[in-house]
Regions:
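Extended hydrophobic/aromatic-rich secondary-structure runs
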Residues: 1-4, 60
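Bacterial N-terminal signal peptides that target proteins for export
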Residues: 3-15
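Polar helix-capping/helix-linker motif
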Residues: 7, 195-196
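Short alpha-helical segments used as structural interaction elements across diverse proteins
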Residues: 8-9, 68, 203
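Hydrophobic helical h-region of N-terminal Sec-dependent signal peptides
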Residues: 15-19, 23
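C-terminal segment of classical bacterial N-terminal signal peptides
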Residues: 22-30
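Active-site-adjacent loops and short helices of periplasmic peptidoglycan-processing enzymes
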Residues: 30-184, 188, 193-195
């Protein structure tokens, strides 16, 4: 029985390590007793990936600012479109002045020069590995026309997945009123991501 833990993390969480850091998988015996994990978090959830059974939780439905865990949904939407053919890996994406990182210490960035382009696949890597806010915003604009419209797409996907305590306002996770998620919802998103990536040969190659 595979299990996934979704704890609550801080603003500076690097999405490039979310599989290892925010969702650490472990194998447990089907009949073994599950002890409540001792985690220094205000919210977490431990689920069986195969069945969705909740093995342990604390404030799992309580919304909180998801910070860079937001980029899980951003990258999920990009990967969906790559698999459907709506996006191509080598498709150029413009780094607009609005998306461009200006070197602020408050942001994690890929640092693509302003008014230049980078391929979709490089932008995706910049989002996942570097937690790039610039890459996230550029891809949001490329797909949705604006980050606001892309956030609407994020919320549509969240509804499909069954994320009932989540609302996205942007593609980066930067603090914004109304931008929230729960550990329970992020577990559902993690399941969707794993299902998408591990049932696709093309995604496996990436």
């Amino acid at each position: 029985m595979k299990a996934i833990v979704i704890p609550q993390y801080t603003q500076r969480l690097m999405v490039g390590t979310f599989v290892a850091a925010s969702f650490f998988a472990t194998t447990v015996q089907a009949n073994a007793a599950i002890q409540q994990p001792e985690l220094d978090n205000s919210a977490f959830i431990l689920i069986d990936y195969d069945t969705g059974t909740v093995l342990a939780q604390k404030n799992a439905a309580q919304p909180f600012p998801p910070a860079s865990l937001t980029k899980m949904m951003t990258s999920y939407i990009i990967e969906q479109r790559l698999l459907s053919g709506a996006l191509k890996e080598n498709e150029p994406v413009l780094m607009t002045p609005e998306a461009w990182c200006k070197g602020s210490s408050e942001e994690s960035c890929m640092y693509v020069p302003v008014n230049t382009t980078a391929p979709v696949i490089d932008m995706l890597k910049g989002i996942i590995i570097q937690s790039g806010n610039d890459a996230s915003k550029a891809m949001a604009q490329h797909i949705g026309g604006s980050e606001t419209t892309f956030a609407d797409l994020m919320n549509e996907e969240a509804k499909k997945i069954g994320m009932t305590h989540t609302h996205f306002m942007n593609a980066t996770g930067m603090p914004q009123e109304g931008h929230q998620a729960s550990a329970e919802d992020l577990a559902k998103l993690a399941q969707a991501i794993i299902c998408l990536l591990y049932t696709s040969d093309a995604a496996d190659e990436r």
